[in-house]
Every structure is written in C-alpha cells, then in structure tokens.
C-alpha cells in the first residue's frame, strides 16, 4: 500500500472518513464535493483499488488523502486499511463511495456522542423487490449465526461512525475482506461490550451503478461462505482457519467468484 497524498496536518484531527473505492470515478467526485465542505470532517481517506481515474479526481480535494492498494483488498480489506491509517482522535466514519445518506443526515450521525459505534437502519427510497427480499433473507441468516445480534435492524448500510480508539482496538478481529465486513465489525464491537446505537435514516440505493447487482449470485455465495468463516473464527474450531488446506481452498473459491 503506497500513500499517494498526505499534505494534511497531523494535529487536531477529530473526525476522519474512510471511503473504500474500487473504480469509483463516476461517483467519487459527487461524494467528495458533499463531504469536504462539512465542518465536522477534518480529513477523508480514499482507499483506492482498480485502474480508473478515482485517484486523479480525489487529488483535487484539499482534505483528501489517497491510499492506493498494490493488490486487490476487497471492501473489508480497504476499510481495515483506512482504519489503520486514520489519525483521528475522536471518530472514524466509514462511507460508501455513492454517498448513500444525505450530508445533513451524516452530520446528525457525527453529533451523536453516547455510542461507540453508530449503525444505520436503511429506510430505502428505491430498491428492487429482489434486492429487498435478499436483504431480509441475509439479515435472518446472520441472526441465526449470531443470536446476540438479534436486535440489529440492518447490517449492510454503507455508513457507520465509530469512536477512533475503539475502532483501533477491534482491528485485529476484523478478518473479513469482502462485503461481510459490516457484520464482522458490528460483532467485534458487541462482544467487547461496546455500546452500539442504530439510527434509521432515508437511504438512496444506486442500482444503476451497483457493483453487487451486476454479479449478485457470486456475491451471495461469497458472503454466505464468509458468514461461516466468521462463525468458525468465534468458536473452539478457530484453528481450522490457519490450516494450509483451508487457506488454499479459500483462495481458489475467491478467485472463482471474483
């Protein structure tokens, strides 16, 4: 991972936003336009993967630091790298590149001070029936695997806000590199006894540019396998994940589904 831009001052950085960006040239500009003007946001880390103009666009913004991955990290890997590199002393936020909530509602989340992790329950403005059905099915399956998360109304919303110190503390538990990172993160906070608060907000789903919709079946299979992996990690059988045979099989599956 090579750091491309870091012209920002290190001190007094209260809030940083981490944006995982895989070929997001069509959407990243609008998102950075909205976030860089917010007085609460001191810096933005764009973790870039791919081969489009995303870094070139991001470099135009003074608050933005671009981290360019030398290999494919996946959304989870990009988020972990962003948290690791963040220097905020108060809060670290995670935001999808399509700006799924309004700047006003994002500011509302940043003002909440009585929780270690703030997650969003999506009130969808536009979503297909198929995606909604899959969303509900995934939520049910996740709760069967992790009963202590039965109260969670939504795992996959593309915006979360965390206390910076707590985010750093759970880093070594974040083992998922794909889209299941949200469940991994929430459960890591929950099992440590950190306070989690869920806020319902209007949510805009960008179906036209959604990478998930274009390979939905592969994503479903990969997330199901990652759910099993996460459950095994938090079980007496955790050692299986370090077996060479398991690692080799995992790499082959990921390659086949990518």
Regions found by a protein language model. Name each.
Residues 47-55, 99:
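A conserved acidic beta->alpha catalytic loop
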